[in-house]
């Protein structure tokens, strides 16, 4: 029998110390990794519930195990809520991650060796969109499109590649692109060659839910997303569709289970349900609007300080700082900013001469700091501090001064109070 009197810090002090240190880091450092955010305490409460104990292979009402009547309620709540959030008529909330959701779509709709057309990782796409190091680039014949000299998707070039290679699937979505995507144009390109249009909206799902970024739901055959990032839920994935026929729905359902997954993570699905309820609240739209305002304030400030932003600015939650030609690499900049308690990630930029392990870019995002309560002026200040560090990454005095300023700012906006 378990004892409620035993605490983690006494039973496993090594692990407890690591968890406490990470909690402290999240409070004391500014989080600018575009794919990270903070879950609400309610989301974490659901994820830490007894639902973690339950096996529930199958779907609500059609399980392979007994005792699923209550986890069925949790999963159905998640399904119904996410359909309402995005205006979908099909939703699968079981994928363990965005990458698994993408894998499910490929395996449901394609055969090994089929041609896919996706955005190059080096130009802002994602590993799972056909990168050679990923299964999507090994199982399928992956053709890649990129951005032009202005850092924008060249839709005429995408059309040319589609016409030339006749892909069975066109993939739209990104991990490092700061402008709005013309989903209708992508659908027209896909239709012109008889291809599926698959949209991975993982990075902008929260913005889409709030109506501050165009929705792909009326254009794509199938849509996937993560449930963290801008959606601000637990780490996980979802698959959505609108107007999908019965055959497509059956393929998607059966490929998730039993195709590539067994038992779903019911505690995570419960946490997803909480996050989806939060996404339906009026405050969520206000939050997403502020995410974009904050990103634009940061981008404009960095531009004013002489730093190049790929595509010239941002219309979403992120920006890509291009440092080609500068002495500092993305790797060195990430390390220097880390010493100043500013957490970012190095990132390749279009036509990057440095390796992906070094890079000439930084990806910055505002979802996490906006959750803390940051406003535009806070982001102007923060962007100036970032520029100060990038101007003098080896100057310990500058790093110390910025670290002190960041510490004071973090105390002003605690994550969990």
Curated annotation (Swiss-Prot):
A Gene Ontology BP annotation from the UniProt entry: tetrahydrofolate metabolic process
CDD domains: SHMT
Catalytic activity: (6R)-5,10-methylene-5,6,7,8-tetrahydrofolate + glycine + H2O = (6S)-5,6,7,8-tetrahydrofolate + L-serine
Recorded GO MF terms: glycine hydroxymethyltransferase activity; pyridoxal phosphate binding
List of residues binding (6S)-5,6,7,8-tetrahydrofolate: 121, 125-127, 355-357
Annotated Pfam families: SHMT
Gene3D superfamilies listed in its UniProt record: Aspartate Aminotransferase, domain 1, Type I PLP-dependent aspartate aminotransferase-like (Major domain)
Subunit structure: Homodimer.
NCBIfam families referenced in this protein's UniProt entry, alphabetically: PRK00011.1 (NF000586)
Protein name: Serine hydroxymethyltransferase
Species this chain originates from: Xanthomonas campestris pv. campestris (strain ATCC 33913 / DSM 3586 / NCPPB 528 / LMG 568 / P 25)
Gene: glyA
């Amino acid at each position: 029998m378990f004892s409620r009197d035993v605490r983690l810090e006494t039973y496993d002090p090594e692990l407890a110390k690591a968890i406490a240190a990470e909690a402290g880091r999240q409070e004391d450092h500014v989080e600018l990794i575009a794919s990270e955010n903070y879950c609400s305490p309610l989301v974490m409460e659901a994820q830490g519930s007894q639902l973690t104990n339950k096996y529930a292979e199958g779907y609500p009402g059609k399980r392979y195990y007994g005792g699923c009547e209550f986890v069925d309620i949790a999963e159905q709540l998640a399904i119904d809520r996410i359909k309402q959030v995005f205006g979908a008529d099909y939703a699968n909330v079981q994928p363990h991650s965005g990458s698994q959701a993408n894998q499910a779509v490929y395996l449901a709709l394609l055969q090994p060796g089929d041609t896919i057309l996706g955005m190059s990782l080096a130009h802002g796409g994602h590993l799972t969109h056909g990168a050679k190091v990923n299964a999507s680039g090994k199982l399928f014949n992956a053709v890649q499109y990129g951005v032009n000299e202005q850092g924008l998707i060249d839709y005429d070039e995408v059309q040319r590649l589609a016409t030339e290679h006749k892909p069975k699937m066109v993939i739209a979505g990104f991990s490092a692109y700061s402008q709005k995507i013309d989903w209708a144009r992508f659908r027209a390109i896909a239709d012109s060659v008889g291809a599926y249009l698959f949209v991975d909206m993982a990075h902008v799902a929260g913005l889409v839910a709030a109506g501050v970024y165009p929705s792909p739901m009326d254009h794509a055959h199938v849509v996937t997303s993560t449930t963290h990032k801008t959606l601000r839920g637990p780490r996980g994935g979802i698959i959505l569709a609108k107007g999908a026929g019965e055959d497509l729905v059956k393929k998607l359902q059966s490929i998730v289970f039993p195709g590539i997954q067994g038992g779903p993570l019911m505690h995570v699905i419960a946490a997803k349900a909480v996050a989806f309820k939060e996404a339906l609240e009026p405050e969520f739209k206000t939050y997403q609007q502020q995410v974009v305002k904050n990103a634009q304030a940061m981008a404009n400030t960095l531009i004013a300080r002489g730093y190049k932003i790929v595509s010239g600015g941002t219309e979403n939650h992120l920006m890509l700082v291009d440092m080609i030609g500068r002495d500092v690499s993305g790797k060195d900049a990430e390390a220097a900013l880390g010493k100043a308690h500013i957490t970012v990630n190095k990132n390749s930029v279009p036509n990057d001469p440095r390796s992906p392990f070094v890079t000439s870019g930084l990806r910055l995002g505002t979802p996490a700091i906006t959750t803390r309560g940051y406003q535009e002026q806070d982001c102007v200040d923060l962007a100036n501090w970032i520029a100060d560090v990038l101007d003098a990454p080896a100057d310990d005095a500058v790093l110390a001064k910025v670290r002190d300023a960041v510490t004071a700012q973090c105390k002003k906006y605690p994550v969990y109070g």
